[in-house]
């Protein structure tokens, strides 16, 4: 696992609205309201997480992500590769204001190889403000502002070429 400054997620071109030419089967994946981990599990024998970067960062390091999150002195950053049957399917980047990491949710800094979805969707205190669709060259991406017990976190997901999203 790295703590370097380079994000595993390259710049994404975010769409203001859902693209009109978005195929229905791809839209179904991108607009998934449940756990992407659970959805991936329907397409493989085993899902596992490879953590790439886990550390606290400053607001200056957020770039345009700062527009989506409240002001905080520090943010927990977690970048991972999610694999299905040992094939990289998704790059994930989670940015969590330090204030969200209170009480039992402090456990978010210790997820290690546990998929984020297992933690977030394990209870009934999760809501989603929005899903925004984007492209990174030929790859589809999405980001969601989620609230855990009313406290925000920003999740960005890039679907890699081997992802079942593309095998429709």
From Swiss-Prot:
Binding positions (substrate): 36, 78, 116, 157
UniProt entry keywords in alphabetical sequence: Cytoplasm, Lyase, Pyruvate, Ubiquinone biosynthesis
GO molecular function: chorismate lyase activity
Major enzyme class: lyase
Main location: cytoplasm
Keyword Repeat attributed: no
Cellular component terms (Gene Ontology): cytosol
Pathway: Cofactor biosynthesis; ubiquinone biosynthesis
GO biological process: pyruvate biosynthetic process; ubiquinone biosynthetic process
Compartment(s): Cytoplasm
Domain of life according to the entry: Bacteria
Catalyzed reaction equations: chorismate = 4-hydroxybenzoate + pyruvate
EC number: 4.1.3.40
Function comment: Removes the pyruvyl group from chorismate, with concomitant aromatization of the ring, to provide 4-hydroxybenzoate (4HB) for the ubiquinone pathway.
Similarity remark: Belongs to the UbiC family.
Subunit and partners: Monomer.
UniProt protein name: Chorismate pyruvate-lyase
Protein species of origin: Yersinia enterocolitica serotype O:8 / biotype 1B (strain NCTC 13174 / 8081)
Recorded name of the encoding gene: ubiC
